[in-house]
């Protein structure tokens, strides 16, 4: 394995040394990710680009903004964090995404898509307003360009005339079509060093000669007319960018030269590079999607060390396929997360009823509204943290009309190693705020099927199921037919929970019984609208309440239960709301984070004992 802390001075190395470094980095990243897990294919695709960027720019002063941030590992290695890469995505270790709190070289946080150009433009404008001197660059992939926010940023940046470099990493061949040999030859000629030097010198000479500015404008118009005759009109040039490319994204020499040229251009520049996702590791090149995010694996075979088991996503996808067999109006939507949300089987069985809209959650919700308005039953499967991006459309396009759109809210709760940007801790709050919303929380695979059937067949307006990442816990039952279940009668304290926290609370209850307390346990299956009557009746009897839930404190079910109890005139002697608190939760394994938040069985037992003993 490469010693990542042995990185040469990138400003002084030769092109040959840079190429050798790229080979070492690529090999080292494969070895490192095989041990830690993480995002592999995207990082292998940007090795040469990242080395070239660090040869040209000073990221301690210049601002490099990553879109999504999956591809930041090489950047971290080159900025003094190589020795800590073994801690990647672990509790207290390096983040798998850019993080300004971690290093001055990380200009901005990343995790969600399509925002990099907007952020970079803001930084460029701040530089101008404050009279400072540094370069600003945004690195965005062709996948992130499927999000409308990217085009909003590009449109505004092109009009701004701010010196700003946007690097488009095109690894999917989805941005430009093959435009023929003449066009490719001209693009190649336009990027030759001789042409770039002549272009720069010609503009400079014309600016000082008498009448030179007029001559330059005329010749520039002639050149543009010829180019537009032979080349297709560039979207980016129409937006106001100086467009360079497409070029080989694995040529570190050429990239270094182009970046040095591009950073001196006055105004916005778009450098279009073509890369191979998974470059240099054959299994990842053959199947880049499978090696996008990986667990620990064997480098020789590419096989995971621990095969993944059954998951909530898989249970959701299987249940949806069954319901789609019964009702031809049912269709499925994903925002570039077909496999992650368990919809691969649905696409194979019902290709005409499956829609992948790209990284466009707002569009997905609005399109679902259109489908529902015309009689279909759309189901949008989406990660909890990404559904946040479609909240306005959920309110405006779905809820006001009371349209029957169903949301499969995957990765609800703590998701683990991806950290703050990916935990699903806010969906209960924002979904419960939507008028007419019905929100379910299954605690087992069986309940996923039962509750999804209810959402599709028994709800008139918007409905949602929230379920966690990974597999089910020790509870495998199906109580999904009732809104609120009194799972165990008792006295002394009422324990309330739902979803993935239910098994931990059952384990805590067993410990309580061993200590002489027989708690009453209430399992909430429907979180919105809440069925308060069983909770009011129970708390009136026990006098004490503990609510455990894997969500943020503000807008939690516990807060709504307390408000409902107060309105009903039920005042418990002691209350404890166990949740993830008011701050952001860091990265770590789900078990580590549950202990951190006090949501593991032992912590819940200790909290319940304190409430029970309260006089």
Annotate each PLM feature.
Residues 136, 140-153, 342, 354, ...:
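Extended, hydrophobic alpha-helical segments in both membrane/secreted and soluble proteins
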Residues 39-160, 329-330, 334-335, 343-344:
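Cofactor-binding active-site loop characterized by glycine-rich and histidine/acidic residues
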Residues 6-11, 15, 30-38, 102-108, ...:
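Glycine- and acidic
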Residues 87-119, 129-133, 159-290, 304-319, ...:
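Thiamine diphosphate
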Residues 34, 46-55, 119-124, 148-155, ...:
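Short alpha-helical segments and helix-capping/turn motifs at coil-helix boundaries
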Residues 1-78, 235-256, 269-275:
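N-terminal amphipathic, basic-rich helices that act as targeting or association modules
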Residues 44, 66-68, 140-141, 168-170, ...:
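Glycine-rich, histidine-containing beta strand-loop boundary motifs that form or position
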Residues 296-298, 432-475:
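Helix-enriched interaction subdomains in cytosolic or periplasmic regions
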